[in-house]
Amino acid sequence: MDDVPAPTPAPAPPAAAAPRVPFHCSECGKSFRYRSDLRRHFARHTALKPHACPRCGKGFKHSFNLANHLRSHTGERPYRCSACPKGFRDSTGLLHHQVVHTGEKPYCCLVCELRFSSRSSLGRHLKRQHRGVLPSPLQPGPGLPALSAPCSVCCNVGPCSVCGGSGAGGGEGPEGAGAGLGSWGLAEAAAAAAASLPPFACGACARRFDHGRELAAHWAAHTDVKPFKCPRCERDFNAPALLERHKLTHDLQGPGAPPAQAWAAGPGAGPETAGEGTAAEAGDAPLASDRRLLLGPAGGGVPKLGGLLPEGGGEAPAPAAAAEPSEDTLYQCDCGTFFASAAALASHLEAHSGPATYGCGHCGALYAALAALEEHRRVSHGEGGGEEAATAAREREPASGEPPSGSGRGKKIFGCSECEKLFRSPRDLERHVLVHTGEKPFPCLECGKFFRHECYLKRHRLLHGTERPFPCHICGKGFITLSNLSRHLKLHRGMD
């Protein structure tokens, strides 16, 4: 019998080409088909609010948010409840109201599994009953492995990639249940994965996250959990980004403060252990006088804990040497002054960290500025005497005759007899005295208002005209003052 050749299988139909997503977010890596979708998404990473209310000036990220806000001015309530005559400005308010009629309780407490009809009721319950408490493990969903207890630091289940703990699961996401909050509603996580949604959902506000550690950080906002402690002042924070920003306030406290390298030391780590991770970077770490607070865009979402916690401890590591900032980055001194460049900030920091060349003849205290010494003499010893302080400063100059940096200019030697403030010139003192006398010698001929200084009058007169001397080079809008222009330019930051 002749062998019958096996029929050749029909060629598989070509797979459908994946849709092009050419627009990528530089912050989180997500891709979008249209530029408009990317712009709308990127607003989450920035403080940009391009849609302004024409009545009150309040800004919004999206046009539909502005449309909802405008109804607060007009009183329009287009969303009507079918069970009662109540009306609402937006569909969200109507949905929250309808649970009164249906008896539905969609908000679940992950600690005791009580359910609530409103988010505010759940929030009150969490703060009263479970303040500082994290959820206990729940049973995993079908088809998912059994889980051990979650990590006490970041609530991960299984081998913890954040803090080095160990457990039963492995991997990341709902299929491995290793680096996520698999114990927080794993059945829902599996269903969400099938629906191509972020698998980890918050039972308090229904926000979804790609990783369990993000949900852990988010849940802390509902329960007031603050696991991140500052090793210098023992203040608590519920996010590592807030702790890092707070640590910068300690940078200018002087040589007596604990070294920054100690931040990365875990519990039980000795001096040698604490120094291993920082010795190689000591040459690149910025000096205390060169620290700067880089103000990143607001609204960046929940900070990820991965890489921010050292192995074996709950404290955040020392801040690494700052990357070279872009030209749009703002620099802020701890005294609250903002600067557009690092050079301007460094020049300003001389006032805080300059050489202590002015000495007090009574107690020997040293100060970098003459005004600071005179303030000390007035408060501590009940006297002034700028000339005596200047003489003492000259006696302390180096033998080489080289004047110390910044010591020969900008001295404040003209004092006010009312409040004893010091000024650099008689003109500045005369301008200041008007504060005590209440005199306002500069009137506006348009509206009759009076002003203490001529510069205030000039700025006010711009309100009556069309001149806007400070235009925006991006959109062309004009402003009366430079400070208003600076605030406006922050709206464009991140979209260039």
Swiss-Prot record:
Assembly notes: Interacts with FLT3 cytoplasmic catalytic domain, following receptor stimulation, in a kinase-independent manner. Does not interact with other structurally related receptor tyrosine kinases, including KIT, CSF1R and PDGFR. Interacts with NRL.
Start-end of C2H2-type zinc fingers: 23-45, 51-73, 79-101, 107-130, 200-222, 228-250, 331-352, 358-381, 414-436, 442-464, 470-492
Pfam families: zf-C2H2, zf-C2H2_15
Bias type Low complexity, positions: 259-280
Protein name, entry field: Flt3-interacting zinc finger protein 1
Region (Disordered): 250-280, 378-412
GO biological process terms on file: positive regulation of transcription by RNA polymerase II
SMART domains: ZnF_C2H2
Source organism (scientific name): Homo sapiens
GO terms under cellular component: chromatin; cytoplasm; nucleus
The UniProt record lists the keyword Transferase: no
Keywords on record: Acetylation, Cytoplasm, Metal-binding, Nucleus, Repeat, Repressor, Transcription, Transcription regulation, Zinc, Zinc-finger
Function: May be a transcriptional repressor of NRL function in photoreceptors. Does not repress CRX-mediated transactivation.
Any one GO molecular-function label of the UniProt entry: zinc ion binding
Modified sites of kind N-acetylmethionine: M1
Record flagged with keyword DNA-binding: no
Subcellular location as annotated: Cytoplasm; Nucleus
Superkingdom assignment: Eukaryota
Known tissue expression: Widely expressed.
